Amino acid sequence: MLPLINFNVVDPSTTRYKRTHNTAVAYTENQLRELYGAWKVILCNSGLEALNTAIALVKPRTLIVDDETYYELRVNFQYYMDWIDCDYIQISSLDDEAELKSSLENARKPILVCGDSPSTFAHWKDVKKISSLAHQYGAYTMFDNSVVSLFYSNPLKDGADIVVESYTKYVCGHGDTFAGGIALADSMQWLDEKEVPVPVCGLQSIMTVVSRRGNIANPLSAYEVSRGLETLAVRMERHTKSATLIFNTLKKADIQVLYSGKGGLITLWGMQPDFCERFNHFVTVGTFGCTYSNANYFRSDSYYKSGICTRLSIGLEDPDFLIKDIEQALQIPLWDIYLSVKGDTKCD
């Protein structure tokens, strides 16, 4: 006969038939909460769903974004606008104080200001300044830090109310797991007290919304996130070191290139559509932050108003090997420049 076991290992106030939570999810959320210094972290089934769920939780009457805010978030919200009562405002830059102030004035509350820090285009937002101004108008700020992960960017520390991250990228790091997260500051505790239609017995407001959306992180993904956190520091340092070498080489070769200074994501301007097809090693996929290097071409003028660009995600391979693949893809000599840059780096 089996011994008596208590299978109800998760706080029953946050559990409904073990669907919204289980031990793996609860454990990983607690790890992330401590790392962010957050009031609460909600593990989601993807980064995009984390963004959508955060918006569903706040239910803004005004959403303010800028030209570099994650494209899928903006497209999805504009699609939703057909049946929700919300004003959508897109400005050129959240760092433009006058433009942001103008958009906040007379905006309907709740107001949610959304940005990326850093963005695909290597711009680090002044989160402290943006959040301070937004709070003067009773607005909340949400920043996506997926481009460099929580290892390098934690907007909560600079006054943001919400941080959303795609753990599919650097945190899991292998391109084989879908997961995302919402980190909430103390300022968002009101979300658990707000009224929700048809509340779920035993669940507070936040988990009721998460449950209703079907945004359920599975135990294996939670485990992958937790495991990824163990090696995140080592991997991020390697991504950064290799990407810095390659960025400096491309810049010295007079190629239009942008890099935030952290992580492995590099953006190149003016590449032809067949550029990504020339690689022998770089894989053409629409993600980044993986152990393997990949490239992704997109026509950014369609939504970023910035022209044609290609994102290179520098993986954990030997940068000597990677620069040779980039050299043959660009069809310009880079090796000697690379050796010079590498030598200068060693001297530093």
Question: PLM features: what roles do these ranges have?
Answer:
Residues 1-23, 28-31, 311-313:
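N-terminal "arm"/small-domain region of PLP-dependent enzymes with the aminotransferase-like
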Residues 3, 178-180, 264-266:
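Structural beta-strand/beta-sheet cores of well-ordered domains, especially the beta-sheet scaffolds
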Residues 23-27, 45-49, 283, 321:
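Generic alpha-helix structural propensity
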Residues 32-36:
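A short, N-terminal amphipathic alpha-helix
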Residues 40-257, 338-343, 347:
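Conserved PLP-enzyme active-site core in the AAT-like
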Residues 251, 256-342:
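Conserved C-terminal alpha-helix-loop-beta "cap" of PLP-dependent enzymes
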